[in-house]
Amino acid sequence: MGRFIFLSFGLLVVFVSLSGTGADCPSDWSSYEGHCYRVFQKEMTWEDAEKFCTQQRKESHLVSFHSSEEVDFVVSMTWPILKYDFVWIGLNNIWNECMVEWTDGTRLSHNAWITESECIAAKTTDNQWLSRPCSRTYNVVCKFQE
């Protein structure tokens, strides 16, 4: 009986010490502020990258940023693996929903845009965002909530 109590107490201590420390993320993912992140050194188009992320884990998508601290965390993950490179992030203008108008205030009625939509990539060195054709291939950072 004493062994059982000791073992039960030991398991309780391990469980309590692991809760809230990223234990809810799979071992190959990194935890930050209730989310799990993973860098994939696989170059693919933006659309394929988003699809790839959704196939990795339920509710996983290309990374989104909601604070400068989160940006710093992701840069600290991507830099050692990818060095000077770009990664796709979860921003795009695929549906071209921006309202564009001329400097004289008239709306755009003739469209001569290249049909390629623009997606957003982030530099791994400082996370500056750049608009890139969605057909370009870059590495991937996926994110999901723990």
UniProtKB/Swiss-Prot annotation:
A molecular function GO annotation: toxin activity
Tissue specificity of this protein: Expressed by the venom gland.
Region forming the signal peptide: 1-23
Keywords, in A-Z order: Disulfide bond, Hemostasis impairing toxin, Platelet aggregation activating toxin, Secreted, Signal, Toxin
Location(s) in or outside the cell: Secreted
Pfam family, one: Lectin_C
GO biological process: blood coagulation
One GO CC term, this protein: extracellular region
Domain C-type lectin residues, every copy: 32-143
Disulfide linkage: 25-36, 53-142, 119-134
Superkingdom: Eukaryota
Main location, first listed in the record: secreted
SMART domains: CLECT (SM00034)
UniProt-listed Gene3D superfamilies: Mannose-Binding Protein A, subunit A
PANTHER family linked to this entry: MANNOSE, PHOSPHOLIPASE, LECTIN RECEPTOR RELATED
Subunit structure: Heterodimer of subunits alpha and beta; disulfide-linked.
Similarity comment: family membership: Belongs to the snaclec family.
Function: Binds to platelet GPIbalpha (GP1BA) and enhances platelet aggregation at low-shear stress. At high-shear stress, blocks platelet aggregation in a dose-dependent manner.
Protein name: Snaclec mamushigin subunit beta
Record lineage: Eukaryota, Metazoa, Chordata, Craniata, Vertebrata
